[in-house]
Amino acid sequence: MPTINQLVRKGRHSKVTKSKSPALNYSYNSMKKESVFNPAPQMRGVATRVGTMTPKKPNSALRKYARVRLSNLIEVTAYIPGEGHNLQEHSVVLIRGGRVKDLPGVRYHIVRGALDTAGVEGRKQSRSKYGTKKD
């Protein structure tokens, strides 16, 4: 417990919260060739690799992912939600924050139904999350 005098001299410091999706916090200034702090909710990128990976211990599956080079030149691993996808190398995708709990290092999701990513075929419920149009 600090004394009043210590509080007057040093004061209280507020906690610094760390971002859960740090790649979305920066944009790239190509004229100055430098990163600029400019947080964004989503970001566009180009898929450099599309593949599958296996989840952590209690679970078993082949989860689809894409390695994406963002418009701020940062490369991240993003999860492709839903059943089936049309992504391949050089597809332009939109990513948002949001981790996948059983895939280490995957902190981003690809937005279905935006840019080159098609919505999930035959989806009837929660369509807005998977970019599916109403029949």
From Swiss-Prot:
Entry GO CC: small ribosomal subunit
Family of this protein: Belongs to the universal ribosomal protein uS12 family.
PROSITE patterns: RIBOSOMAL_S12 (PS00055)
Pfam families: Ribosom_S12_S23
Compositional bias ranges of the Basic residues kind: 9-18
Protein name per the record: Small ribosomal subunit protein uS12
Disulfide feature: none
Subunit record text: Part of the 30S ribosomal subunit. Contacts proteins S8 and S17. May interact with IF1 in the 30S initiation complex.
Gene3D superfamilies reported in the protein's UniProt record: Nucleic acid-binding proteins
Keywords associated with the record: Ribonucleoprotein, Ribosomal protein, RNA-binding, rRNA-binding, tRNA-binding
Source species: Lactobacillus acidophilus (strain ATCC 700396 / NCK56 / N2 / NCFM)
HAMAP family: Ribosomal_uS12_B (MF_00403_B)
Cited function: With S4 and S5 plays an important role in translational accuracy.
One MF term in the entry's GO annotations: tRNA binding
InterPro entries: NA-bd_OB-fold, Ribosomal_uS12, Ribosomal_uS12_bac
Record flagged with keyword Ribonucleoprotein: yes
Gene Ontology BP annotations: translation
Domain of life of the organism encoding this protein: Bacteria
SUPFAM superfamilies according to UniProt: Nucleic acid-binding proteins
Region (Disordered): 1-20
